[in-house]
A protein has these predicted regions:
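Active-site- or binding-pocket-proximal scaffold segments within functional domains
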Residues: 1-393
C-alpha cells in the first residue's frame, strides 16, 4: 500500500458542519483534495466542536443550557481525544504523514492528542484495545516519572504495543496548524470564579499541550483583541528560537472568531488567518495537497468588525458576567513584515495598523510600549511592586 496522509481536524466550541458559516477548520477540510497529484491518498477525520452534542430532537431551554455548559467547561474532551487517537491507530502505517489542525478548544484537543502520541506512540491494530490503558498512562500524575514519556513504564508500553517504525516508538507529526488555542477544561479562569477554578482545574493538569520533538512544523494564529476570560489563550511557549521557519506563533487582529472563523461578519479577517495557514503549508513543503480555489475567500485586513459578540444571548450574558482578561503579547515578537521569527505580529495586523486610523487595541498598545521601554519597563514594575509592598497593598 502506498504511503498516505492522515489529517485530523478538530473544530471549535459549539461548531460543527451544520453551522451557517464555516470555521477555518471546515474551510480547510473543504479545500483538501482526496489525493495528491502523484496518487497519494489524503484521509480526513473531522471532529465537531465541544458542546455540539444534540441532547434531543427538539431541545428545550434546559437542553440548550446543558449544551452551553458543555462547551464552556470542555466536557467530553477526553472522549474526543480518544476518538482521534483511535482513528490514527487504526489507519497509520509506517511511512504515512500525520497532520493535525484545530481551532479554539479543538486546537487544545489536537495539542493534547500530540502529547498522547509523544507519550504512548500509536498502537498496532492488534493492540487497539489497549487505548484506554494508553490514556491512563498519559493521565499520569505530574509527579509519576515512570509514566512520563521518558519513564520506564511509558518506554516499555511503546516497545510492546506501539508501531515501532522509529527507534523511540513514536511517529512524526508532519504539520500542526492551530487557530487561537483556548483552555479546554474545567472552570473558566474568571475573576469571580478564581478560587473555584483553581481547586477544580488541578484535576485536568495532566493534559500535555506542549510542543514536543516529534512535531516537525507547528503554526499558531492567535487573537490580539480577544479579552473574554472564558477564552483564555494557551500559547505555544516552546517555539524553536533558531528562526528555522518551521515553528511560528503569529498575532492577528480581531477577536476569537476573527482568527478561527465561524462568523460571516468577520470573514475578511478570518480568511487572512486561513490564507496564512495555506502559505505555511506550502512554505514547509508539507506535501498536503489542497485547492484554495475550491472555497470562496475574501481578504480584508482593514475591514470593519465587532469583537466579542456571542452568537446566542445566553452565551454573551455568561461571558460578560465572567469578566475580561487582556492578553499579553511577548516582548520578543518580531514586527518585521514577512518575518520567519518564532513569534511575530502578523502581516495582517501590521497592514491594519497602518491602514485603519485609530486601530491600536490595548494589548498591541501595551506591547509597543513595553518594547520601546525595554529594560526600563521591568525596572518600573519592580519599583511599583516595592511601593505596593511597603504600603501593604
Amino acid at each position: 500500500m502506498a504511503d498516505k496522509s492522515l489529517i485530523v481536524l478538530c473544530d471549535g466550541t459549539w461548531q460543527d458542519l451544520n453551522q451557517p458559516f464555516p470555521t477555518n477548520v471546515v474551510r480547510l477540510l473543504e479545500a483538501i483534495a482526496p489525493q495528491t497529484k502523484d496518487g497519494k491518498d489524503q484521509i480526513v477525520y473531522y471532529d465537531e466542536g465541544i458542546g455540539t452534542q444534540q441532547v434531543s430532537i427538539e431541545p428545550s431551554l434546559i437542553d440548550n443550557l446543558i449544551k452551553v455548559a458543555g462547551g464552556a467547561l470542555g466536557l467530553g474532551i477526553d472522549h474526543r481525544i480518544l476518538k482521534c487517537y483511535r482513528f490514527l491507530c487504526l489507519n497509520y502505517r509506517p511511512g504515512d504523514s500525520i497532520f493535525l489542525f484545530g481551532f479554539s478548544r479543538g486546537a487544545y484537543t489536537v495539542r493534547s492528542l500530540a502529547g498522547l502520541i509523544y507519550n504512548c506512540g500509536l498502537l498496532k491494530s492488534e493492540h487497539v484495545r489497549m487505548i484506554t490503558h494508553a490514556y491512563s498512562i498519559y493521565r499520569k500524575p505530574n509527579s509519576d516519572k515512570e509514566r512520563a514519556p521518558s519513564g520506564s513504564e511509558a518506554i516499555a508500553f511503546r516497545k510492546k504495543y506501539a508501531i515501532t517504525d522509529r527507534p523511540d516508538g513514536r511517529p512524526r507529526i508532519k504539520f500542526m496548524g492551530l487557530w487561537d488555542t483556548v483552555k479546554a477544561l474545567g472552570i473558566p479562569d474568571a475573576p469571580v470564579l478564581r478560587q473555584l477554578s483553581k481547586n477544580v482545574n488541578k484535576h485536568y493538569e495532566f493534559h500535555d499541550h506542549k510542543l514536543s520533538s516529534i512535531i516537525d512544523a507547528a503554526f499558531h494564529a492567535v487573537s490580539i483583541e480577544e479579552e473574554r476570560s472564558t477564552f483564555s489563550l494557551i500559547p505555544i511557549d516552546q517555539l524553536n528560537t533558531t528562526n528555522c521557519g518551521c515553528h511560528q506563533q503569529a498575532w492577528f487582529p480581531g477577536g476569537h472568531g476573527a482568527v478561527g472563523g465561524g462568523e460571516a461578519s468577520v470573514a475578511p479577517l478570518s480568511d487572512c488567518a486561513l490564507q496564512w495557514m495555506f502559505e505555511k503549508l506550502d512554505q514547509n513543503d508539507s506535501g498536503l495537497h489542497f485547492d484554495a480555489d475550491r472555497i470562496q475567500m475574501s481578504f480584508g485586513p482593514n475591514s470593519k468588525h465587532e469583537i466579542n459578540k456571542g452568537k446566542f444571548r445566553i452565551i454573551e450574558t455568561i461571558t460578560n458576567f465572567l469578566g475580561k482578561k487582556r492578553r499579553t503579547i511577548p516582548i520578543h515578537a518580531d514586527v518585521t513584515p514577512k518575518s520567519i521569527a518564532s513569534e511575530v505580529i502578523s502581516d495582517t495586523a501590521l497592514e491594519r495598523l497602518h491602514g485603519v486610523k485609530g486601530w491600536l487595541p490595548p494589548s498591541l498598545h501595551d506591547f509597543y510600549l513595553r518594547k520601546k521601554l525595554g529594560n526600563r519597563w521591568d525596572n518600573l514594575l519592580s519599583e511599583l511592586q516595592e511601593v505596593a509592598t511597603s504600603l501593604k497593598l
